[in-house]
Amino acid sequence: MNAFLFEARIPRVVFGAGALQHLVREIDAMGSTRALVLSTPEQSADAERVAGILGSRAVGVFPRATMHVPIELAREARLEASRLGADCAVAIGGGSTTGLGKAIALESGLPILSIPTTYAGSEMTPIYGVTDNGVKQTGRDARVLPRTVIYDPELTLGLPIRMTVSSGLNAIAHAAESLYAHDGNPVIGLMAEEGIRAIGAALTPLQANPADLVARSDALYGAWLCGAVLGAVSMGLHHKLCHTLGGAFNLPHAELHTVILPHALAYNSARASQAMERIARALGVSSAPRGLFDLAERSGLPVSLAALGMPREGIELAADMAVKNPYPNPRPLERDAIRVLLEHAYDGVRPS
């Protein structure tokens, strides 16, 4: 076995159907008394429900989170938290809402309690991202790692099936890249493979019955593991491309992961054959890139960048940006090869 470094940095996790009932207990355990509740506009009713549970412990609701965390919105949210005298942020929703909480925490140090309603996994990481003038800047900082995460599968029952699958594939992307990370280790590998298996196994019954609470629990469990590995090791080409394309063209986050993942894995497959075998085994397919592409296509999800609204002329810019700053990846970053990858992803070509 090769030498490795393992360091655990994970939040307190409260998991189970009905776990939202423990919200007040968990806020008290954090030592907080003045919570600002965050959500997207679409989940403002959920935010109001959370504020109602908190009662006097809630000082306001900020229902304006949006994908890729525009820097102007982050500033406004920080000012609102300061104006209200908030001593913590409670983020209910997906990665956009957790991301806004992180943007607040990065400057203010406010602790975050996250209540995920998708499978994004951001709640388990010290990774933040903000978008300024079409460029998404990401980084790692211990201040943005949520203090506590409440995983309540009942809160995912209303997640539309297309979003369920795309969010699940987003989570699988985290685990897939961790399996060939240069700083990976055996513990992370076990968590990643189990996370992929749990989500993959849950998606089929959920497509038949989106209200299957057992499958919802399995998917959320898998998302927890996939998010944890995202926060523990470095990501490669897939995540770089998604951050580049998402920030530059304002493309939907989960669907973008769905489109890019099969092609990024195909690009790396010759240099990461063991990782590809583990991903395929966890999903019960013969080929990881083709298996993930086929799953998305069967589920009626977009499988091309064109379908997401990206302009074809953006391919050259994206290829330039993808190789601008070196980062670890199993296969060397070759601009022409990445341009071909992007062309295939743009046209929705099934990986060979």
From Swiss-Prot:
It holds the Pfam family ADH_Fe_C. It catalyses: 3-oxoadipate + NAD(+) = maleylacetate + NADH + H(+); 3-oxoadipate + NADP(+) = maleylacetate + NADPH + H(+). Pathway: Xenobiotic degradation; (2,4,5-trichlorophenoxy)acetate degradation. InterPro entries: ADH_Fe/GldA (IPR001670), ADH_Fe_C (IPR056798), Alcohol_dehydrogenase_Fe (IPR039697), MAR (IPR034786). GO terms for molecular function: alcohol dehydrogenase (NAD+) activity; maleylacetate reductase activity; metal ion binding. Its EC number is 1.3.1.32. GO terms for biological process: 2,4,5-trichlorophenoxyacetic acid catabolic process. Keywords: Aromatic hydrocarbons catabolism, NAD, Oxidoreductase. Belongs to the iron-containing alcohol dehydrogenase family. This is Maleylacetate reductase. It comes from Burkholderia cepacia (Pseudomonas cepacia). The lineage of its organism: Bacteria, Pseudomonadati, Pseudomonadota, Betaproteobacteria, Burkholderiales. The gene is tftE.
